[in-house]
């Protein structure tokens, strides 16, 4: 197969979006030579409580965050935010695959923590027919293939060659050595509520927006 440009997607609640979301993905983009990462903020998350901020507020914070980020790496896709039901990743990628065509390399960005639970995801094996999995490191989680030595349908998918992601449309797992930032949205919300400093955990514009809107108080 000829080399094609990989398009990567990164979903989340982004309640609020912070450096722990953005900086590892920026590092991943440099390692994999991504020209664009498409953010997929969701409306109703799976397997976690409803967001504290409204969809409109979370979308605004996401726009502010990428405006504060140098370059034009990030863009936003609002399709999951417009849904009034939870968004299954495999269903979103079925639609994306139909839009991008059968041969375009597509990637889903997740954290090392999510990789551990990937075999339990809804129709996870079907997901590998639709996209690659690009994994960012997470604090406290062992890097890379550890834990999959006895998982036959996962182990053979791992590659340490990022260029391989451009030569097939889906099916590979690439674990990137990205910054491990111990930042979480729940910690930020807790800090806001407790009137503790948090300005260094997210971009300036998002910090200002949270204060102006009185979010998470």
Curated annotation (Swiss-Prot):
EC number: 2.7.7.18
Chemical reaction(s) catalysed: nicotinate beta-D-ribonucleotide + ATP + H(+) = deamido-NAD(+) + diphosphate
Keywords in alphabetical order: ATP-binding, NAD, Nucleotide-binding, Nucleotidyltransferase, Pyridine nucleotide biosynthesis, Transferase
Key word Membrane present: no
Functional pathway: Cofactor biosynthesis; NAD(+) biosynthesis; deamido-NAD(+) from nicotinate D-ribonucleotide: step 1/1
One Gene Ontology biological process: NAD biosynthetic process
GO MF annotation, one: nicotinate-nucleotide adenylyltransferase activity
Protein function: Catalyzes the reversible adenylation of nicotinate mononucleotide (NaMN) to nicotinic acid adenine dinucleotide (NaAD).
Family: Belongs to the NadD family.
Protein name: Probable nicotinate-nucleotide adenylyltransferase
């Amino acid at each position: 197969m000829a080399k094609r440009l990989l398009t990567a997607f990164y979903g989340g609640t982004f309640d609020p979006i912070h450096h722990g979301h953005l900086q590892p993905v920026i590092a991943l983009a440099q390692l994999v030579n991504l020209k664009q990462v498409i953010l997929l903020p969701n409306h109703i998350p799976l397997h976690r409580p409803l967001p504290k901020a409204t969809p409109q507020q979370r979308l605004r914070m996401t726009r502010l965050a990428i405006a504060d980020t140098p370059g034009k790496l990030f863009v936003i896709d609002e399709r999951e935010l417009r849904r009034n039901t939870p968004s299954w990743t495999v269903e979103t990628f079925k639609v994306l695959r139909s839009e991008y065509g059968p041969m375009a390399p597509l990637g889903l960005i997740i954290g090392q923590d999510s990789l551990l639970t990937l075999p339990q995801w809804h129709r996870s094996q079907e997901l590998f027919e639709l996209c690659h999995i690009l994994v960012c490191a997470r604090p406290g989680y062992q890097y890379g293939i550890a834990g999959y030595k006895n998982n036959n349908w996962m182990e053979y998918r791992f590659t340490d060659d990022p260029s391989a992601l451009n030569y097939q449309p889906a099916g590979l797992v690439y674990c990137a050595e990205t910054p491990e930032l111990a930042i979480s949205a729940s910690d930020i919300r807790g800090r806001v509520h407790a009137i503790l400093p948090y300005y260094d955990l997210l971009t300036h514009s998002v910090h200002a927006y949270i204060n102006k809107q009185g979010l998470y108080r």
